[in-house]
Amino acid sequence: MIKVGILGTGFGTTHLELYSKVDGFNIVSVFGRNEEKLKEIAEKYNVSATTNINEVINNPEVDLVDICLPTELHSKWAIEGLKRGKHIFCETPISCSVEEATAVQQAAEQYGKKVFVNLFIKFSTPHQYAIELAKKAELGGLLGIRSYNKTSSRWGNLGLQKNVESFHNHMMDFVVEIAGLPSSVTASGADYDDKSIVTSALNYDGLYAVLESNSCLPNCCPFEIGFELLFENGIARFDAIYHEEFEKEEFLVTANGKPREIVELDSKDEYEEVLKHILKCLKCDVKSDLIDIDNAIKGVKLKEMILKSLL
């Protein structure tokens, strides 16, 4: 049983629910600043709750510290947890800068503990399928990637910089898993206070990728995501619409000399799959090849490249 201490009661409450669905974890303690909310959490989940963050990271029972704090606090408390002999599971992004992320990486090596970052997009069924399709090269060489997401203001502030850091970044993790870091980036965008549109063109040798994040949709519109992978001998395309009243997902593969294939997608929850992956890595004492600090740093590097071009 992996014993967990959670820092933060914003997205941390979502993590609490997720842990309750995955066997092998036990929540020991939760830190937050809102005493009323902490009381509700303690009663609902039968856990210890505190406004003293050190009570969680110093707790000898805690094996894994789950960080759901504001991004600017991620690296600080990841390092503090590592110093105290804890493994770390951190919400994405791991840090605000490559320098901070590298400090976390060095601390993990120094103290001999594992760092996992919630790069959940890699466990999304359609994205997993696309990644495997690209790696197997069954449709020939990969020529281009296009990925998009669109939303209304339901996620709060997604102005230009916040868009790149908290919305655009999921697509970045997807593309980096397939193609690695680009040689250069050209980004453009339009900023409307707490809303924005960001388009990034990623340049590789013999490959292009275009990412677009739009947080300007009216509130009546559904959340949309999708991607298209262009191969020498075919195209793989996924489009999804998520609305309060309906959902629609479609994954099509079109290849030379073959009938169009509608891919049947498993209904796995990518967030639960992340926890199962972490559990396996900790039980087997192996490093993650998908969501470790090394993979997370690549995402932070790409974010800095995009922001440098954009701002």
Where are these regions (language model features)?
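Hydrophobic residues in well-ordered beta-strands that form the structural core
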Residues: 51, 90, 115-117, 238
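C-terminal helix-rich "cap/oligomerization" subdomain common to oxidoreductases
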Residues: 55, 64-69, 110-113, 263, ...
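Short polybasic amphipathic segments
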Residues: 227-229, 244-257
